[in-house]
Amino acid sequence: MCDMLDNKLGNRLRVDFSNISKQIEIPNLLQLQKKSFDYFLNLDNGESGIEKVFKSIFPIHDPQNRLSLEYVSSEIGKPKYTIRECMERGLTYSVNLKMKIRLTLHEKDEKTGEKVGVKDIKEQEIYIREIPLMTDRVSFIINGVERVVVNQLHRSPGVIFKEEESSTVANKLVYTAQIIPDRGSWLYFEYDAKDVLYVRINKRRKVPVTMLFRALGYKKQDIIKLFYPIQTIHVKKDKFLTEFNPNDFMDRIEYDIKDEKGKIVHQAGKRLTKKKAEQLIKDGLKWIEYPVEILLNRYLANPIIDKESGEVLFDSLTLLDESKLAKIKEQKSFDIANDLANGVDAAIINSFAQDGETLKLLKQSENIDDENDLAAIRIYKVMRPGEPVVKDAAKAFVNDLFFNPERYDLTKVGRMKMNHKLGLEVPEYVTVLTNEDIIKTAKYLIKVKNGKGHIDDRDHLGNRRIRSIGELLANELHLGLAKMQKAIRDKFTSLNADLDKVMPYDLINPKMITTTIIEFFTGGQLSQFMDQTNPLSEVTHKRRLSALGEGGLVKERAGFEVRDVHATHYGRICPVETPEGQNIGLINTLSTYAKVNELGFVEAPYRKVVNGKVTNEVVYLTATQEEGLFIAPASTKVDAKGNIVEEFVEARQDGETILARREEVQLIDLCSGMVVGVAASLIPFLEHDDANRALMGSNMQRQAVPLLTASAPIVGTGMEQIIARDAWEAVKAKRGGVVEKVDNKSIFILGEDDKGPFIDHYTMEKNLRTNQNTNYIQHPIVKKGDIVKAGQIIADGPSMDQGELAIGKNALIAFMPWNGYNYEDAIVVSERIIREDTFTSVHIYEKEIEARELKDGIEEITKDIPNVKEEDVAHLDESGIAKIGTHIKPGMILVGKVSPKGEVKPTPEERLLRAIFGEKAGHVVNKSLYATASLEGVVVDVKIFTKKGYEKDDRAIKSYDKEKMALEKEHHDRLLMMDREEMLRVCALLSKASLNSDQKIGDKNYKKGQTADISELEKINRFTLTTLIKAYSKEIQKEYDDLKNHFQNEKKKLKAEHDEKLEILEKDDILPSGVIKLVKVYIATKRKLKVGDKMAGRHGNKGIVSTIVPEVDMPYLPNGKSVDIALNPLGVPSRMNIGQILESHLGLVGLRLGDQIQEIFDRKQKDFLKELRAKILEICSIPRLANEKEFIKSLSDEELLNYARDWSKGVKFSTPVFEGVNIEEFSKLFKMAKIDMDGKTELYDGRTGEKIAERVHVGCMYMLKLHHLVDEKVHARSTGPYSLVTQQPVGGKALFGGQRFGEMEVWALEAYGAAHTLREMLTIKSDDVEGRFSAYKALTKGENVPATGIPETFFVLTNELKSLALDVEIFDKDEDNE
């Protein structure tokens, strides 16, 4: 399909090679974070996350029942500063949270201590300051720095069953169950080598599971009945009889079934059918004989008590033998735990055997008989060893562990998972454990061990969920409130007298909440410095999923399984995009179409299939909902009516690929590209690349630096405009309308809605610094008179071209060696690329300096600096700050600053100087801000902040006046446009109505009943208009008044907006304590492509520029055009990224077809528009879904010319991932573009002019310049700073350090016998302090370097030994000989 890319989003046509027409639009890429934070702040009027957290902590009661604190309501304030102000002034973009708290004073019954009534109620509003607010671009401004909170992928609360190999016994599997809460104690169930079932709480010492059941209040008999079927045995005439139950004989029968009289009614070894069993019951079979040999290994379910004496003969769980059976015969009946008859596990019986001994010992030490109390005490001792305990405290402790909502929270998700897994029907709102949960978990684990249950996969996306910003913030708020709750309870206990005077504010300290939240944003692992290199890096950063962070995994201990791609990732998590290195697989990205539901589970979209027919109904399913369903891939052949063509389809079911009948298929993938994430879906022909290289390609696109002029790729995938649509860099129209005025800095759009006309104003941001020091600049892409729709991109941001992402440049490349310069992935570049600034980028650096108030006086920003030459400060203005436009070189002063020197008695020379030059010269010292060693560029902006109460300097006043003038001009322009529009509408209204009296309008006279010409009406002014309107009917006068009132209201709104902006401008600067002035200087640096810069394609094909060759020396084509870049052909086969070859083929086709369109322009014949239309139609008819002819025919001549001009530089293609151009389409394109079918061409050597022996693959590839720039990495040191302790040179470019001469380098010098060089390296070039000083002296005087001394390292060692109380003496060699 020839996709116009929805003309509202960009002005570009692309030939689209999709196989499948898109059913739904790609959802907003940032909706997960937006929705999550909106829920937290309650922006859609439901119960907010904040409300829920407050309600979970409040009310707080006084232990003595005197007071209670209740939460009433909360209200969110408005931000005090704008986003731009916060970034410039280093503030946090935040709001105040106002919460209403009610303090109730109770009347107490003196005898019972119970509450009997309310004495007093007080309500108070308490402010919680600085709750960071999400910006409209889904980031946070913390202390002036833009940050992103990454989504966390963590283990879902609920129950999970696992099977692992035993660490102690070979070839034995160990089964475990875990109940995982969101907050509270984890509960582990596990078998040991002897098949005893144990339980652990929070990985403490294990106790038999029956101990926990007893602590929960269950008696021994209750536990037996819960886990084992009980069989009653009747004793009759020395025979053991039991009731006949056919269900006991479902499998083959081990013994003969005999009736009461001993007659065999069914023989052993034969199967008892249902029919036969019914017949036996009909025949009156009620009792059957229970064989003694079977009875011998059974356990008693209930104790057997002697009827006469009342003493217990045998306790429950006694193992029966012949002697015991003989004694039991005297009883009429007894119960046995029919444990092993149905293959039921003996684990619980074994656990009873284990806990019996422990309870006996506890009985003696604690003097308590109740086994339930003893079990609670045992659990308390395991959890808190060494602490004294009483039974009530132990019971309360066990209850608090799992049943107290303050301490334990499963969450709605955990409850849903528990109910689903264990078949429970506990209501959703019960988020603590129940006894039934614990019993059912133990039962299910026994089933799992016996091969009947289902083992869980912890990496299944049904067992992992996403915590987004809203939930993470709610958790932090809960932590802060929990600390505050503890503090309030402590205050309650210390309150004795004057309870009537206590106010909520006396009890609540809101700082505890603020500090917890700010700590999370500044130091949390999930709050990260936003990657702003280009729009793609920003969007993918906000879509990132991290398994690390608080409550997540630790990267050092994360195994291979958790990092691996899981079958459930399909359509939910991108299998390609993840970092290389130790975080591989732990940090992922959401797939393009994936959504996250309310419970935090990732959903993938599918279309429903009914009886082999694909419907248009799209459903989003989680990994759990998808289980067991047959899902066909998007590439399944479907006819025009949507019926699946082939009878058997390759489908997926639970991660396995199987062959299914078309009638069995229930779902089909929405599209082929749903598997991968945003970055991977930007790689054309991704299906032809090896996954490892695609991973590098995805990651390197995020590192592409925005270039001076952006150009969209010739070979795109259609995702470019989606990223531009959702990235905040582009300016999008809030409301539709007509472009009234456009210049480099602003766009004015005049529109009309239900209320009437309006003017929207958009300001273009210029030369702003991003987090990665790249240049943020916007430029309009609309013209005056253009009609725009709401949401349309009206201005491109950095790395954007006509509303599409453009992170690199289209370059003509040849795969050929060039004199060894492209050995090992190196890149040979033509000088033309540098001359035309193709890969030039602008970077902005911020340098700041502050003037402080010191005890000796105040520091001053000034041009008057002591001991500095006049020419060194010539570029500074009168205020001592570099002028805008100044070319900065390393070592130049950016801002002059002098600091007062402490008073010292002056020397005679100083006294003389003071007498000559005045008082000041001696008192101050130069503390100016200098340009660092690698900083070179132009000053583009200066920001000056002055503390309230201190005088602003001239530069700050001029800067303020300039900004004020810009605001005034913008306001004036908007008012003018409003006035013009008002007059136009009034004239249009009056020109349609007839006059009620004779009037002279302009130069013409009109009689009553005539209508005035609009041209004459436009000549009159406003004052004449007020009298003229009276000559019209009352209806017209009313319409005129309505129109006038509407425009007056709009002007009032504009005035209010303008006043608000002025107020912001005039606000006092907030600076840290002690700082009186802060100056920020912004320097823009132009970085041209250099040898050493890193470049890459989109397929993981990266390399370093090795040489820049004059254009005339580069290989050239038969038409004389030289190639831009020469790449090594050996970089392709072993890397298996063939996508780059296909991309360069299609890119060349685009260039050649573009040349053909340019030829039509150049010929400019009479019917050239007709020819253009025919050519574009011919190109667009090649893709499979060629249904664009109507669209191209419907284009006006002007629209067609716009698209054709764009295509003349290269026809743009869109080849979505997994739906790329096929062989037939390629051959058609090659013929149309007049390219040889092998895609190769003859090339000539630029230096000799000779034809190159072999035909060479030449194509057009989209190349990126990455932010690993040589200018920022190259570094050299002669002398510089030394480390204080070791006296060795410091390391790193930032500290102006030296190169490390390590162990292996020492070996190299040793191997060559370079003894003197080695000695120099280890002494005077390193840490021989005296040696380096004397060497420097000798070198300056031209003498020989003297002998080296003792390195400082030796003294450090001796001092270390001295600190261990070892005396170290150093003897000279000569002294020793004596």
Swiss-Prot record:
What superkingdom does the record give? Bacteria
Q: Name one GO biological process term.
A: DNA-templated transcription
An annotated GO cellular component of this protein is: DNA-directed RNA polymerase complex
Quote any Pfam family the record assigns.
RNA_pol_Rpb2_45
Q: Which UniProt keywords apply?
A: DNA-directed RNA polymerase, Nucleotidyltransferase, Transcription, Transferase
Q: What class of enzyme is it?
A: transferase
Keyword S-adenosyl-L-methionine carried by entry: no
- Which chemical reaction does it catalyze? RNA(n) + a ribonucleoside 5'-triphosphate = RNA(n+1) + diphosphate
The UniProt entry's sequence similarity note says: Belongs to the RNA polymerase beta chain family.
Subunit comment for this entry? The RNAP catalytic core consists of 2 alpha, 1 beta, 1 beta' and 1 omega subunit. When a sigma factor is associated with the core the holoenzyme is formed, which can initiate transcription.
Give the protein's function: DNA-dependent RNA polymerase catalyzes the transcription of DNA into RNA using the four ribonucleoside triphosphates as substrates.
Q: What is this protein called?
A: DNA-directed RNA polymerase subunit beta
Source organism per UniProt: Campylobacter jejuni subsp. jejuni serotype O:2 (strain ATCC 700819 / NCTC 11168)
- Quote the gene name from the UniProt entry: rpoB
